[in-house]
């Protein structure tokens, strides 16, 4: 197997944020706020940025908007950190189109969520990813999040896909440390295994994961960077100490479907307007006090 992406794989580590897509109250993408968030994340030490993933509301952006956000994102980052662009779809041709757009924009890697809703078989998943890999020559990351997609990329399927040299990583958002550990044991020398679950990410790092693609890092980028920088050095005592101080935030960011709570939090922090797109709605009032208390305890709001 070719190693032409070996150097790039070493960049896929540490604290990576699945950044929200800021929107105005009318639902339009708020590009000035997006630029500010990107700058803040980089200043706070985030190692890698993910554009228009699940947290970035990829499902409710039009194809043109999706492409426009990726182009803006890459241009504004301007090489300061790697950019991973969410380009997954449950239609293989659409995923190929979005991945081609990400490559044209200059993104460093494409993040490809498993096709949702139409429930492909394992062979269908293999053929889907194979087609994208062959159609667009750029680093690609598998994304397994069965809680959202209702399909689970089996380890055997990942092992087959690891034969493609541009399939460089997998984001494992199953929330199962055991599942992640099995992946690392079988494939850790071939592809980069990243956590996609804030609550279990540090534990998975102990077993050889290289980093975490995070929702919570939207609001505490410095703390998350500190956690995973320490973990990469093998200093799990420091990592756990910082992690424990922000662990309550992980739960709060999922009191309703993400990115509802994290957008509410960023709005309370003055970082974004109160904008989200249907069918997602603003955080239910019954959770406001709970989330506010958590933000206050973390020193994020007065």
From Swiss-Prot:
The name this protein goes by in its record: 4-hydroxy-tetrahydrodipicolinate synthase
Main location: cytoplasm
Entry GO terms, CC: cytosol
Gene Ontology molecular function terms on file: 4-hydroxy-tetrahydrodipicolinate synthase activity
GO biological process: diaminopimelate biosynthetic process; lysine biosynthetic process via diaminopimelate
SMART domains linked: DHDPS (SM01130)
Function: Catalyzes the condensation of (S)-aspartate-beta-semialdehyde [(S)-ASA] and pyruvate to 4-hydroxy-tetrahydrodipicolinate (HTPA).
Binding of pyruvate, residues: 55, 213
Subunit field text: Homotetramer; dimer of dimers.
Keywords linked to the UniProt accession: Amino-acid biosynthesis, Cytoplasm, Diaminopimelate biosynthesis, Lyase, Lysine biosynthesis, Schiff base
Organism: Psychrobacter sp. (strain PRwf-1)
Classification of source organism: Bacteria, Pseudomonadati, Pseudomonadota, Gammaproteobacteria, Moraxellales
Database matches in PANTHER family: 4-HYDROXY-2-OXOGLUTARATE ALDOLASE, MITOCHONDRIAL (PTHR12128:SF66), DIHYDRODIPICOLINATE SYNTHASE (PTHR12128)
HAMAP family in the record: DapA
Localisation per UniProt entry: Cytoplasm
Pathway annotation: Amino-acid biosynthesis; L-lysine biosynthesis via DAP pathway; (S)-tetrahydrodipicolinate from L-aspartate: step 3/4
UniProt record similarity statement: Belongs to the DapA family.
Superkingdom per UniProt: Bacteria
Catalytic activity entry: L-aspartate 4-semialdehyde + pyruvate = (2S,4S)-4-hydroxy-2,3,4,5-tetrahydrodipicolinate + H2O + H(+)
UniProt-listed Pfam families: DHDPS
């Amino acid at each position: 197997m070719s190693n032409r992406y070996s150097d790039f794989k070493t960049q896929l580590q540490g604290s990576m944020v699945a950044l929200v897509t800021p929107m105005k109250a009318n639902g339009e993408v708020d590009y000035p706020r997006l630029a500010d968030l990107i700058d803040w994340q980089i200043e706070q030490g985030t190692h890698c940025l993910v554009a228009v993933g699940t947290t970035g509301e990829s499902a409710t952006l039009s194809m043109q908007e999706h492409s426009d956000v990726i182009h803006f994102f890459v241009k504004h980052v301007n090489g300061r950190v790697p950019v991973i662009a969410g380009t997954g779809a449950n239609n293989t041709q659409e995923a190929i189109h979005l991945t081609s757009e990400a490559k044209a924009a200059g993104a460093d890697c494409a993040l490809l969520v498993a096709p949702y809703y139409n429930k492909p078989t394992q062979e269908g998943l293999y053929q889907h990813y194979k087609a994208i890999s062959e159609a667009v020559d750029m680093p690609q990351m598998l994304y397994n999040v069965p809680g959202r997609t209702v399909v689970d990329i089996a380890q055997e399927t990942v092992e087959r896909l690891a034969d493609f040299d541009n399939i460089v990583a997998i984001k494992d958002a199953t929330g199962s440390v055991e599942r992640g550990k099995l992946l690392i044991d079988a494939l850790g020398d071939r592809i980069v295994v990243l956590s996609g679950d804030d609550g279990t990410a540090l534990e998975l790092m102990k077993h050889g994961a290289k980093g975490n693609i995070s929702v919570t890092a939207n609001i505490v980028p410095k703390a998350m960077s500190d956690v995973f920088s320490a973990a990469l050095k093998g200093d799990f005592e420091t990592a756990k100490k910082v992690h424990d101080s922000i662990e309550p935030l992980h739960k709060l960011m999922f009191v309703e479907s993400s990115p509802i709570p994290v957008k509410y939090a960023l709005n309370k922090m003055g970082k974004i307007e109160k904008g989200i797109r249907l069918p997602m709605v603003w955080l239910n009032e019954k959770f406001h006090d709970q989330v506010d208390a958590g933000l206050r305890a973390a020193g994020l709001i007065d």
